[in-house]
Amino acid sequence: MRRFLLPVIFVIAAVVYSSIVVVTEGTRGIMLRFNKVQRDADNKVVVYEPGLHFKVPLIDSIKVLDARIRTLDGSATRFVTVEKKDLLVDSYVKWKISDFGRFYTSTGGGDYAQAANLLSRKVNDRLRSEIGSRTIKDIVSGTRGELMEGAKKALSSGQDSTAELGIEVIDVRVKQINLPDEVSSSIYQRMRAERDAVAREHRSQGKEKAAFIQADVDRKVTLILANANKTAQELRGSGDAAAAKLYSDAFAQEPQFFTFVRSLKAYEASFANSDNIMILKPDSDFFRFMQAPKK
């Protein structure tokens, strides 16, 4: 009897064990019967909350789906602004499953890769619409917050809504905005040309101002030199006049001494060079101070 009882107990235990399903915290379970989604009386997909549940062995199965917030980190995508300028925008999306039944059916059985692909398309379509209505300046510095908020609202409602996928978008964020290499090079060349033009203009203005300053300095120098020469001429004239007056006064007071001094200077100048030749009579008046005084 015991020989037959043990297998029966083992089978019953196995059946009971295989009938128990544990849905852990942070997940939800969807009941599948013969791989078909089970629905309740209201035709809604049966979703199991975290806890202990039962199923029919070999007939029912549970598909466990993650109920936590997930992050879709997309690659940089090219978008066109209202100015017809290309931008490379790198963004990410925070999302979670809001309708587990719809998510399961719309993603081919809860395929997260397919869900990410579908969500990425919707996000890019929304960003394309938002960026296409703004300028580069608005996107880079002005209304980036409005852009992200607009994308989030559009993905939560309207034709771009992710509700049809059973997904709720929690947040949309733009990580980085860059220009394509060819556009960056073009803008760099244009900025360099503009800076070169400004530099040339500044240099031209500087040269013009330097020439003006130089001309003004030259004019002032010429005026100062002219005034100095005028003053020097006046002083020289005054000095010559004073010297002439002194000579005249001295001559008037001591005419003989004055004549003697002038003769000595004449001798000095005449005999300074040994090569000088003078043809004069010995009794010439030039030598009167070199002759013996008359008795």
From Swiss-Prot:
Cysteine-cysteine disulfides: none
Top-rank taxon, per record: Bacteria
GO CC terms, sorted: membrane
Membrane topology listed for this record: Single-pass membrane protein
Record-linked Pfam families: Band_7
Protein's cellular compartments: Membrane
KW Transmembrane (keyword) present: yes
InterPro entries reported in the protein's UniProt record: Band_7, Band_7/SPFH_dom_sf, HflC
Transmembrane segments: 4-24
UniProt keyword annotation of Manganese present: no
Record-linked SUPFAM superfamilies: Band 7/SPFH domain (SSF117892)
Keywords carried by this UniProt record: Membrane, Transmembrane, Transmembrane helix
Subunit structure, as described in the record: HflC and HflK may interact to form a multimeric complex.
Function noted in UniProt: HflC and HflK could regulate a protease.
Family assignment from sequence similarity: Belongs to the band 7/mec-2 family. HflC subfamily.
Protein name (Swiss-Prot/TrEMBL): Protein HflC
